[in-house]
From Swiss-Prot:
The protein's name: Potassium channel toxin alpha-KTx 16.8
Annotated InterPro entries: Scorpion_toxin-like_sf (IPR036574), Scorpion_toxinS_K_inh (IPR001947)
Disulphide-bridged cysteine pairs: 7-28, 13-33, 17-35
Gene3D superfamilies: Knottin, scorpion toxin-like
Molecular function (Gene Ontology), one example: potassium channel regulator activity
GO cellular component, one term: extracellular region
UniProt-annotated site: Aromatic residue of the functional dyad, residues: 36
Function field: Poorly competes with (125)I-kaliotoxin binding on rat brain synaptosome (IC(50)>100 nM). Is a poor Kv1.3 ligand. May have as real target KCa1.1/KCNMA1 channel. Shows weak toxicity on mice.
Similarity remark: Belongs to the short scorpion toxin superfamily. Potassium channel inhibitor family. Alpha-KTx 16 subfamily.
Keyword set, alphabetical order: Calcium-activated potassium channel impairing toxin, Disulfide bond, Ion channel impairing toxin, Neurotoxin, Potassium channel impairing toxin, Secreted, Toxin
Length: 36
């Protein structure tokens, strides 16, 4: 799901998502990180 992290590129979301979900799968969507 979406987390409260602003981004411009999907790679900016990899670390935050790994901390939240334990998975590095992430996308930057509408300048916000989405974890899968």
């Amino acid at each position: 799901g979406l987390i409260d992290v602003k981004c411009y590129a999907s790679r900016e979301c990899w670390e935050p998502c790994r901390k939240v979900t334990g998975s590095g799968q992430a996308k930057c969507q509408n300048n916000q990180c989405r974890c899968y």
